[in-house]
Amino acid sequence: MKHLISIADLNKSEILGLMDEADRFAEALEGREMKKLPTLRGRTIFTLFYENSTRTRSSFETAGKWMSADVINISASSSSVKKGESLRDTALTLKAVGADAIIMRHPSSGAARQVAGWLDDTAIINAGDGSNQHPTQALLDATTMRNRIGEISGKKVVIVGDILHSRVARSNAQLLTTLGAEVVFVAPPTLVPLGIEHWGAEPDSVRVSYDFDSEIADADVVMMLRVQAERMHGGFFPSHREYATRYGLSQARAERMKEGAIIMHPGPMLRGMEINYDVADAPQTVVLNQVTAGVHVRMAVLFTLLVGEEG
């Protein structure tokens, strides 16, 4: 692996290898008063974010620092991008100052792959490109699932919400079906994109339902997605109240889930919209477990790209 741009670039063995590596990092750090490993000492990592982020950016920064790398954060709003500098010139500048890896988030689909083409010898990690891909989110979601409910093969994962604008949904569909899960998307018709049947590892390996209540009782995982109003131009549903009634995870719906099933959300959560306030804090909700797994998964990705077989 030279870059991590899309889940589609990984085979099953590589996916499981990253998940296993993440678990090893979790074990290595468990019980340590000082969470510091020498793994990436002397390496320089840049985070280059053209969109806002809390979880992903802080998670990558923590992952790099826990492995003793120098991590430098670049925000588009406070860099020469604000003066009109192109993405290519920004990327070449970071390479020239010694970047071993660039972790980037960009509003345009395909931006990370383009940068990887320009900087072949610098590791590029896609932290989200438009509505296209978010590979480390899918890896941490799968790691969280496996740690809570066991092997993913044969499990039913119901992903509910704004599928149209969700890079998380796309990446999860590819990863989970590669590992043998059944993936069901639930959303209003206006938030289901064309070509969704091709999102899985094989044609027609995912399906769409418009009835949340008919899918929840036998689900092993219910993953709620935020309505991305910032990417919407025009009305996609009549009202927030109607959306919450038909597609929100209410207390009543959560109570219909089978024993041992878990609730996930990539964040940020809109409490009262796609998820009930109390459900968001319920024991079966593993949002904070996802955040914790995110650090270990991103440590695994950085280690694999920057050390690999050297380690």
UniProtKB/Swiss-Prot annotation:
Native organism taxonomy: Bacteria, Bacillati, Actinomycetota, Actinomycetes, Mycobacteriales
Any one biological process term the GO annotation gives: 'de novo' UMP biosynthetic process
EC primary class: transferase
Gene (name only): pyrB
UniProt protein name: Aspartate carbamoyltransferase catalytic subunit
Keyword Transferase set for record: yes
InterPro entries on file: Asp/Orn_carbamoyltranf_P-bd (IPR006132), Asp/Orn_carbamoylTrfase (IPR006130), Asp/Orn_carbamoylTrfase_sf (IPR036901), Asp_carbamoyltransf (IPR002082), Asp_carbamoyltransf_Asp/Orn-bd (IPR006131)
Reactions it catalyzes: carbamoyl phosphate + L-aspartate = N-carbamoyl-L-aspartate + phosphate + H(+)
Pfam families, A to Z: OTCace (PF00185), OTCace_N (PF02729)
Cited NCBIfam families: asp_carb_tr (TIGR00670), PRK00856.1 (NF002032)
